[in-house]
């Protein structure tokens, strides 16, 4: 079967490896025929050659791990050892081993859920990041009537903007150095700010500080501090971005004096929140169509990741389709 792996910084190689088959499935696992994958911002450090912490990320120049780093997948069930999945089901969710960039993917069935047949696989793969956003928003206060600021307006940050506005946020501020003014109305952003977060927070008036600040950048330590500085007294800061460092410096005095709450965490209860994402998408039928801006074939994985690494105001979600 076909598979891809990163063999050097910024370089994918297509290979042929032995097929995954039903004999390889453990209890609770599902074998998928690849239909589509989504490129996530958290995939990009691996593409750049950074060494991660997953088993098998041990190549000399890059990970050299089959199928890595894709975790957002849609596919058709070939075989199942999970009670809720059957051959022929079309499902979306997580490639639980972060090896979704191959023709046949083995994943934990508890991280997959069916999607509406009206959606193309490339559109459906957007349900996975939407599920993550909905789960994170469950951890926040009721957003009705609040000012919500999101640092980072990439594919995940724009979803946070959309969900916050749909939840009744009074004002949504989106901060990104890439110009997102063209996408702001469709994603519920009242105040699109084209600036780095340090510049934005340095010029904030007290009345413009937010009731909820969501960090949706990750992979460095600075933006968490900016989120804390941008929070109004009594506010909640949610750190969603992936933490590549073990220790993050924060202004604890500011946390204390402003009575702030800092939260973070990965997505749990994944089948349930995939179901919530499907319901949300049904109620907002324009969302996934607007969200998906670029689709590449499996013969151009390199092109998909090259685009993902370039600042582009027209790019939101990139999918790779079979």
Residue ranges and their predicted role:
Residues 60-66, 70-72, 90-151:
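NAD(P)H dinucleotide-binding glycine-rich loop of Rossmann-like/cofactor-binding domains
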Residues 225, 271-322:
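C-terminal hydrophobic helical "lid"/dimerization subdomain
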Residues 198-208:
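Short amphipathic alpha-helix with an adjacent loop that forms part of the alpha/beta core around
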Residues 84-85, 142, 231:
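Short, well-ordered loop/turn sites that connect or cap secondary structure elements
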Residues 220-283, 322:
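Glycine-rich phosphate-binding loop and adjacent beta-alpha segment
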Residues 23-38, 52-97:
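Glycine-rich beta-strand-centered segment in the early N-terminal region that forms part
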Residues 122-195:
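Mid-domain Rossmann-like dinucleotide-binding core that forms the NAD(H)/NADP(H) cofactor-binding site
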Residues 92, 213-214, 238:
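N-terminal Rossmann-like NAD(P) cofactor-binding module of classical short-chain dehydrogenase/reductase
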């Amino acid at each position: 079967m076909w598979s891809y792996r990163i063999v050097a910084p910024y370089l994918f190689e297509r290979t042929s490896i032995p097929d995954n088959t039903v004999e390889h499935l453990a209890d609770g696992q599902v074998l998928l025929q690849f239909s589509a994958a989504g490129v996530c911002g958290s995939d990009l450090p691996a593409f750049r050659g950074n060494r991660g912490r997953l088993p098998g990320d041990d190549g000399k120049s890059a990970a050299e791990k089959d199928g890595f780093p894709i975790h957002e997948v849609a596919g058709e069930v070939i075989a199942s050892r999970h009670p809720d999945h059957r051959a022929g089901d079309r499902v979306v969710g997580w490639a639980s081993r972060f090896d979704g960039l191959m023709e046949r993917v083995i994943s934990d069935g508890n991280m997959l859920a069916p999607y509406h047949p009206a959606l193309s696989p490339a559109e459906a793969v957007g349900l996975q990041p939407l599920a993550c956003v909905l789960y994170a928003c469950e951890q926040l206060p009721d957003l009705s009537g609040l000012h919500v600021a999101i640092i980072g307006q990439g594919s995940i940050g724009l979803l946070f903007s959309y969900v916050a506005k749909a939840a009744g946020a009074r004002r949504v501020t989106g901060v990104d150095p890439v110009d997102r003014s063209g996408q702001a109305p469709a994603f519920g952003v009242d105040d699109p700010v084209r600036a780095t977060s340090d510049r934005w927070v340095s010029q904030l008036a007290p009345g413009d500080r937010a009731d909820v600040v969501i960090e949706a950048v990750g992979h460095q330590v600075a933006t968490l501090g900016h989120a804390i500085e941008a929070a109004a007294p009594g506010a909640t800061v949610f750190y969603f971005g992936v933490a590549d460092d073990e220790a993050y410096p924060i202004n604890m005095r500011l946390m204390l004096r402003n009575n702030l709450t800092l939260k973070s965490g990965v997505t749990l209860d994944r089948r349930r929140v995939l179901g919530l994402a499907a319901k949300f998408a049904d109620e907002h039928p324009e969302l996934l169509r607007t969200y998906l801006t670029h689709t590449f074939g499996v013969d151009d994985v390199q092109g998909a990741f090259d685009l993902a690494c370039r600042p582009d105001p027209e790019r939101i979600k990139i999918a790779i389709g079979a």
